[in-house]
């Protein structure tokens, strides 16, 4: 019954702290209005009072069910144009907006916690709000498949992302017919806060952002709705301005970790292929998580002329990383800028590194900042986006042999050691495992054939081959473990492909030629 669900959602708002006790009547009336109801029946309210009270834990578990029933009712009553995932997402965001505090209240509370308790207390509050508001859809995030893979470079994180809903055909058709709008300009713009959304743009009435001053300019802080790792946040420029890696970038990253020392923050590179999916709006990504790259040790200490006070080294990592650390962030900014400028103009034909071809620049950096006690630390990942006939998607990009698992750009998150793999792999791997258990060939399968060479390459490591009969001795659980391990090893190869200097004697010698160039 919809009135009961209205009371249940109101209680959810009170228990989670989205709404204050004084907001109860107001919230009920707003929800009645949304569902085009004139009253709350006394007997419904009386019966509800006798129920077991909600707790924070039961509230979290209950939200998906409450919203599902509300959406079913809205569909039956014609309150949505179509009963599809796109329109349901637009409408349930509108439902949740009825519980939300105004932006000014959120900012005041965040700043109060920051000033009187700690930066972590402030982010704890804001992250919980972003989850409780259903801006971060916890019940979808739980569907993501996650595991780890041990390698000589450390423990890599692997995830198959299932929390982004598939676009339904009706929504795709409607989006094509919809009037094209330039508002908000992109998914990151501050104008998204409170926006009702449309068929080709997500609703954001339950979205809140926090103003932060970084390096003297106006930026904003929010969480990613897809949370690839703990407290995955986005820090974005108040202006819709393109990504650019420059001296000021290092200052902004270090300023942010000075203000939020429990978070790391990094920037995608500013060139296609080696950059992220949004190059049109300057932004960083951070969070409360330590990636494999952050844990990776320095394999070779180096020094830079005039910066003997700055600790520097090449990181033991499949991509090409210079780590620098110092007590004074100004020294890091100076050195990072020197390395960036040297790399932008650097060509080493013997190592197949070209600063530009036909006037198109190729060299850039993916920078990551963090605090280590009293020290500031920067990891500078050298990137190059040159393409060739043999590698049309990029020489320093996953090569074709690995595309059956990962062909998308290697952005900041992957660089640090977390594979974000496409949703298609969930079914493909399940079908692949079943075919292996049954001893049937996958070369004839239209979808699975792309995995055949890979499978035939790794199976002998585990003592059997296709159709040998020995696969019958392997349990489904063990086979699943094997496939997950091998996907992790593919991701390691993906990172090695993306590294401009390979982890070989020849590669490290070439790396040192660049270090010498910086020192020249």
Predicted regions and their residues:
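Catalytic or ion-translocation cores adjacent to nucleophile or general acid/base/metal-coordination motifs
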Residues: 248, 257-280, 286-340, 344-347
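Active-site microenvironments that recognize anionic phosphate/pyrophosphate groups
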Residues: 1-235, 239-242, 316-318, 332-336, ...
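Helical scaffold of the NTase/Pol beta-like nucleotidyltransferase catalytic core
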Residues: 206-208, 238-265
């Amino acid at each position: 019954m919809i009135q009961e669900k209205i009371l249940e959602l109101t209680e959810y708002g009170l228990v989670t702290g989205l709404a204050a006790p004084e907001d109860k009547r107001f919230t009920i009336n707003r929800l009645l209005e949304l569902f085009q109801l004139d009253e709350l029946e006394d007997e419904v309210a009386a019966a509800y009072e006798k129920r077991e009270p909600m707790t924070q834990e039961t509230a979290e578990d209950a939200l998906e069910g409450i919203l599902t029933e509300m959406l079913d009712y809205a569909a039956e009553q014609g309150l949505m144009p179509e009963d599809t995932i796109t329109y349901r997402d637009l409408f349930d965001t509108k439902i949740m907006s009825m519980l939300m505090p105004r932006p000014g209240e959120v900012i005041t509370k965040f700043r109060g916690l920051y000033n009187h308790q700690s930066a972590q207390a402030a982010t704890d509050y804001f992250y919980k709000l972003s989850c409780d508001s259903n801006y971060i859809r916890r019940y979808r995030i739980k569907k993501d498949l996650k595991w780890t893979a041990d390698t000589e470079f450390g423990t890599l994180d692997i995830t198959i992302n299932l929390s982004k809903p598939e676009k339904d055909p009706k929504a795709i058709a409607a989006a094509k017919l919809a009037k094209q709008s330039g508002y908000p300009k992109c998914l990151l713009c501050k104008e998204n806060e409170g926006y009702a959304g449309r068929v080709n743009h997500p609703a954001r009435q339950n979205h809140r952002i926090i103003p932060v001053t970084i390096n003297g300019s106006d930026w904003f802080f929010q969480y990613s709705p897809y949370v690839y790792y703990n407290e995955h946040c986005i820090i974005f420029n108040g202006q819709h301005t393109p990504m650019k890696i420059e001296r000021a970038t290092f200052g902004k990253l270090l300023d942010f970790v000075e203000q939020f020392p429990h978070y790391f923050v990094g920037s995608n590179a500013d060139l296609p292929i080696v950059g992220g999916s949004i190059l049109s709006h300057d932004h960083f990504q951070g969070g409360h998580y330590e990636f494999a790259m952050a844990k990776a040790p320095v394999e070779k200490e180096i020094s830079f002329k005039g910066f003997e006070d700055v600790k520097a080294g090449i990181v033991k990592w499949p991509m090409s990383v210079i780590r620098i650390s110092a007590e004074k962030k100004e020294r890091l900014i100076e050195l990072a800028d020197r390395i960036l400028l040297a790399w932008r103009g650097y060509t080493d034909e013997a190592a197949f590194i070209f600063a530009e071809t036909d006037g198109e620049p190729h060299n850039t950096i993916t920078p990551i900042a963090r605090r280590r006690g009293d020290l500031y630390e920067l990891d500078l990942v050298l990137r190059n986006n040159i393409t060739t006939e043999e590698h049309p998607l990029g020489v320093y990009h996953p090569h074709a042999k690995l595309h059956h698992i990962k062909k998308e750009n290697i952005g900041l998150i992957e660089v640090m050691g977390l594979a974000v793999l496409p949703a298609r792999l969930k079914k493909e791997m399940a079908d692949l495992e079943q075919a292996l258990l049954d001893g049937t060939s996958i070369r004839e399968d239209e979808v699975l054939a792309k995995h055949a060479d890979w499978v035939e390459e790794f199976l002998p490591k585990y003592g059997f081959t296709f159709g040998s009969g020995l696969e019958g001795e392997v349990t489904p659980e063990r086979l699943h473990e094997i496939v997950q391990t091998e996907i992790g090893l593919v991701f390691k190869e993906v990172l090695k492909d993306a590294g401009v200097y390979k982890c070989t004697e020849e590669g490290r010698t070439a790396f040192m030629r660049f270090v010498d160039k910086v020192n020249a």
